[in-house]
Amino acid sequence: MSEDRDLLAVGHTAFDYIIHLDEFPEPNTSTAIKRMRNLHGGAAANVALVGSRLGLRTSLVSAVGGDFEGSEYRELLESSGIDIESMILVADESTPTAFVMTDSDHNQISYFYWGAARYFKDAETPADAIKSARAVHLATGDPSFNCRCGEFARSLGKIISFDPGQDLHMYSRSQLERAVGVCDILFGNHHEIDRICSKLSVDIHGLREMGPGVVVKTYGKEGSIIYSDDVIKIDAIPREAVDPTGAGDSYRAGFMRAYLRGADLKTCGRFASAVASFIVEDEGTQTNIPDTGEAVKRFTAQWGYEPPI
């Protein structure tokens, strides 16, 4: 089967409730919601959609409920050129739903209803979708399903990136070893990468020895650090942040866009930072996605040269 897709994203497609508060309430208390919006999200869908807007041919494997059929969200993904033929439909379940709370300091707490995603673990490995992609991104989702997808992709020599995100706590040590062991690029925020190292009893050097030649550790507005044979510090592009939700997923999509075009790691990180800087300027994960030209323009304004991508 020919590789007619650049990037397959595996993991959650979700309906998001983005909720803003002044501060998180203590147990047994309440607090006022300043504003709330019902938007589209899910880490895998975010990566697929941002990647598509950046010119990648993307595909998506998620478990969705009957409410996804005929929805505006399905229409959006299809009209964006994303291949969703391998989506797992659980007709009598609801599509996963995220409730993302953000305080005035942009700290976040998320509550996630798995719904149809509970059926990931029993689903068949999406062999055709993996075969048809040059690279596979394992996003938040069921650990056993992600491990199976990663191992099948590795057997075919695919490029694999892995970002367990907020589902990291669901991985056993054995599952984490399997997923880390098959990936080329490991993404995580600094809390997550530190937890992964702790869970596997390794430092960054030991983590890279387990599989990923590249480990990307993000720090929000403080930027990111790329660990490979070198250690590369990437600055975040200063913007007026409205909502940080989805910035990490867009960073990963931007990074993979540059990486799959053969860019060096510093350019990958800088392009990722440029893409993410758009997402924080509006509420939600998919409301302010740049195209390649817009991201390149912001990259050039920040770093003084046009990226060779």
Swiss-Prot record:
GO terms for MF: ATP binding; kinase activity
An annotated GO BP: phosphate-containing compound metabolic process
Binding site for ATP: 108, 189, 217-223
Gene3D superfamilies, alphabetized: 3.40.1190.20
Site (Transition state stabilizer) residue list: 252
Active-site residues from the entry: 249 (proton acceptor)
UniProt KW Transferase keyword: yes
EC number(s) per entry: 2.7.1.-
Function, in words: Catalyzes the phosphorylation of a wide range of nucleosides to yield nucleoside monophosphates, using ATP, ITP or GTP as phosphate donor.
Quaternary assembly: Homodimer.
Name the UniProt record assigns to this protein: Nucleoside kinase
